[in-house]
Amino acid sequence: MIIGIGIDVVDVERFRRQLERTPGLLDRLFVPAERSLNTRSLAARFAAKEAVAKALGAPAGMNWQDCWIGLDVNGPTVQTKNTVAAVAEAQGVKRWHLSMSHDGGISTAFVIAES
């Protein structure tokens, strides 16, 4: 059963400028394994994290590093711990579905939280 869905779109150039203007933003938003990725990939991962938050009802107090985007043979995966994992567990989320895409300077992500 679908518990929640979320979608987000990020302008890659605007995201790049924000990362450049805001010291520490990269470290605040991303886990170490994500930080070395190019800006387009970071923008897609940020969109995915926003989509996860929306699928969970945008819980207050969500720590950005408690959700990260991994990769396996089937594509991108949603990984959670601490604050995000606790909210997901309380809502009965057992499985995440994630699709990310880039086109024309835009990164987008769509998430389904499933029981």
From Swiss-Prot:
Its EC number is 2.7.8.7. It catalyses: apo-[ACP] + CoA = holo-[ACP] + adenosine 3',5'-bisphosphate + H(+). It holds the Pfam family ACPS. It is found in: Cytoplasm. Keywords: Cytoplasm, Fatty acid biosynthesis, Fatty acid metabolism, Lipid biosynthesis, Lipid metabolism, Magnesium, Metal-binding, Transferase. GO terms for cellular component: cytoplasm. Its cofactor is Mg(2+). Mg(2+) binds at D8, E50. GO terms for biological process: fatty acid biosynthetic process. It comes from the Bacteria. It is an enzyme of class 2 (transferase). Its main location: cytoplasm. One of its GO terms (molecular function) is holo-[acyl-carrier-protein] synthase activity. HAMAP family: AcpS. Belongs to the P-Pant transferase superfamily. AcpS family. Transfers the 4'-phosphopantetheine moiety from coenzyme A to a Ser of acyl-carrier-protein. NCBIfam families: pantethn_trn (TIGR00556), PRK00070.3-2 (NF000832). This is Holo-[acyl-carrier-protein] synthase. It comes from Renibacterium salmoninarum (strain ATCC 33209 / DSM 20767 / JCM 11484 / NBRC 15589 / NCIMB 2235). The lineage of its organism: Bacteria, Bacillati, Actinomycetota, Actinomycetes, Micrococcales.
